[in-house]
Amino acid sequence: MINGSTKIVGLIGHPVEHSFSPPMHNAAFEELGLDYAYVPFNVCPENLKSAILGAKSLNIKGFNVTIPHKINVMKYLDKLDPIAKLIGAVNTIDFKEMKGYNTDGIGCIKAIGEVTSIKDKNIVVAGAGGASRAISFYLARENPQSIHILNRDINKAKSLAEDLKNSKLTDNVDFDSIDKIVGYVSDADILIDTTPVGMSPHVNDEAIVKAEDMHSDLVVNDIVYNPNETVLLSEAIKAGATPVYGIKMLLYQGAESFEIWTGEKAPVDVMEKTLRKTLDL
């Protein structure tokens, strides 16, 4: 029951109607008996500054931040987590310190961590947008053998690769056209697809790599979670490769935000169960 002592956290974006975060977080608060409530707020870009200042005045404890505010919100914060600063985007705010974090990348690392480690692995990242950027900086921190950024717009891939090198987190990064992905996948340990290929409603898109071009030791992560089994993961299963589902990244980035706000260990099993129920899985 919400009362005068309930701590409010939430989501700001535009739009936010279809977010799966509220049920996941509210189930976690209930599981741990925490007097918190998670509420989505639809904030238009022109109202972002007043929303952040108003939230602080209202003693809101934290926000998740989604499109289109992840970059613009940074200018209204007092502090940035070092890796969020490198990524150049924030998806979590802790109002206690007016500090921004980016938990997208750690969500991906933990999802893959269920089946293998990043250390000393050859990794192919498809795409060079915001999600790729967040994930690539976290990958670089885990000491992989190599990171190959492949993108349709090769200049975007080059820019991300250069930023990774300049961060001093890794030297072992290069870039190329996504058209050459088959050659890279043959030597890869992990393939991460950050592109929207196969995302609902375009579930019949052609997979960026076919089963015949994969090998059985490959770990394949698609960050798309709707549908659960994307065209790429379907090909991975056909090839005997290990699939890592997009729902796991959604789960772990949420768990990381939960821990930043509450200081408590997230009940990941309850959060996953709720997420699966919400997604009808």
From Swiss-Prot:
In the UniProt entry, which residues are flagged as the active site? 70 (proton acceptor)
Q: Which UniProt keywords apply?
A: Amino-acid biosynthesis, Aromatic amino acid biosynthesis, NADP, Oxidoreductase
The first-level EC class reads: oxidoreductase
InterPro entries with a match to the protein in the record: Aminoacid_DH-like_N_sf, NAD(P)-bd_dom_sf, SDH_C, Shikimate_DH, Shikimate_DH-bd_N, Shikimate_DH_fam, Shikm_DH/Glu-tRNA_Rdtase
Q: Where does NADP(+) bind?
A: 127-131, 223, 246
Entry's Gene Ontology molecular function annotations: NADP binding; shikimate 3-dehydrogenase (NADP+) activity
> Quick one: which pathway?
Metabolic intermediate biosynthesis; chorismate biosynthesis; chorismate from D-erythrose 4-phosphate and phosphoenolpyruvate: step 4/7
- Please list the reactions this protein catalyses: shikimate + NADP(+) = 3-dehydroshikimate + NADPH + H(+)
Residues the entry annotates as binding shikimate: 19-21, 66, 91, 104, 225
Keyword Translocase, does the record have it? Answer: no
**Summary of the function given for this chain in its UniProt record:** Involved in the biosynthesis of the chorismate, which leads to the biosynthesis of aromatic amino acids. Catalyzes the reversible NADPH linked reduction of 3-dehydroshikimate (DHSA) to yield shikimate (SA).
Give the quaternary structure: Homodimer.
Family note: Belongs to the shikimate dehydrogenase family.
HAMAP family attached here? Answer: Shikimate_DH_AroE
Which PANTHER family does this one have?
Answer: BIFUNCTIONAL 3-DEHYDROQUINATE DEHYDRATASE_SHIKIMATE DEHYDROGENASE, CHLOROPLASTIC (PTHR21089:SF1), SHIKIMATE DEHYDROGENASE (PTHR21089)
Q: What is this protein called?
A: Shikimate dehydrogenase (NADP(+))
